């Protein structure tokens, strides 16, 4: 619990007080945002705003996680980091690097396209594949559990284990499943990062839910004394408290960053931030055994990304007609006349309600066992 509080407080202070220094540095490096001419006219004033703020978020989150553990030192030992926590860090940094390459190419070429679509997907697949292999190979030193399970999960593992099809086929399908989750979550956050503060605020709700879920799973762990009388309710999750610690560190970093990212934004997170955050969200869901619950917890990202898919399919089927004035969905409402801040706050409300529904059903499953 102490590590959780220290991690969140450190990362919040880091982004809140040091982001202005990074803004100056990024301007000096000429890392400014490129704005497309065919976007909403109100966005043209954003041209040149410092981007790649995801570097600040990721740096603060990682440092906060390790500092949180170091500050639990009692003169003899400190709470050790775990494979689960390190895997979340790996996913966030790995996808953040893919996003950084995309952002860097955009700023160098001064165009909206950095990496090609398939190049970006390839990077996500490589990171997700390494994550998947490590997640079923490493073992928690205390519980002996692997960080991830090869079963599909909702509130806990479902009786749908890929390994029932054999080790080779099962492992292959598990890797494909993980790649699908990672690509969906990271691209979902990436698509939502189109208005000042939208992705950062929504991510606070989504990733913040894993502080609650991780801490609850820790208290109801099958390894804890309190769960012996409720063995059918307990959770077989490796290092759930450490998942809560890294989630708290990310949330703290996002809150401090949002101070500078809210309208009018002085810095954007860029693909560095959005892909990294989406990767962290996917990793938290996979390692906490709540993969399918992402439909609620990442509900806003599902809606926004879904609007892009629907627009493209409808456009092709009708030979040029559109459902929305512009996709993603938040730009549709901008073109309808909504102020940017209005769209952002209302989308935050939707994100918060969907996260509440996700956490609520998670708890409801426990009390009805």
Swiss-Prot record:
The keyword Transcription regulation does not apply. GO terms for biological process: cell division; cell wall organization; peptidoglycan biosynthetic process; regulation of cell shape. The keyword Kinase does not apply. It catalyses: UDP-N-acetyl-alpha-D-muramoyl-L-alanyl-gamma-D-glutamyl-meso-2,6-diaminopimeloyl-D-alanyl-D-alanine + di-trans,octa-cis-undecaprenyl phosphate = di-trans,octa-cis-undecaprenyl diphospho-N-acetyl-alpha-D-muramoyl-L-alanyl-D-glutamyl-meso-2,6-diaminopimeloyl-D-alanyl-D-alanine + UMP. It comes from the Bacteria. Disulfide bonds: none annotated. Its EC number is 2.7.8.13. Its cofactor is Mg(2+). Pathway: Cell wall biogenesis; peptidoglycan biosynthesis. GO terms for molecular function: metal ion binding; phospho-N-acetylmuramoyl-pentapeptide-transferase activity; UDP-N-acetylmuramoyl-L-alanyl-D-glutamyl-meso-2,6-diaminopimelyl-D-alanyl-D-alanine:undecaprenyl-phosphate transferase activity. Pfam families: Glycos_transf_4 (PF00953). Keywords: Cell cycle, Cell division, Cell membrane, Cell shape, Cell wall biogenesis/degradation, Magnesium, Membrane, Metal-binding, Peptidoglycan synthesis, Transferase, Transmembrane, Transmembrane helix. It is found in: Cell membrane. The chain crosses the membrane at residues 3-23, 53-73, 81-101, 118-138, 162-182, 198-218, 240-260, 267-287, 290-310, 347-367. Catalyzes the initial step of the lipid cycle reactions in the biosynthesis of the cell wall peptidoglycan: transfers peptidoglycan precursor phospho-MurNAc-pentapeptide from UDP-MurNAc-pentapeptide onto the lipid carrier undecaprenyl phosphate, yielding undecaprenyl-pyrophosphoryl-MurNAc-pentapeptide, known as lipid I. Belongs to the glycosyltransferase 4 family. MraY subfamily. This is Phospho-N-acetylmuramoyl-pentapeptide-transferase.
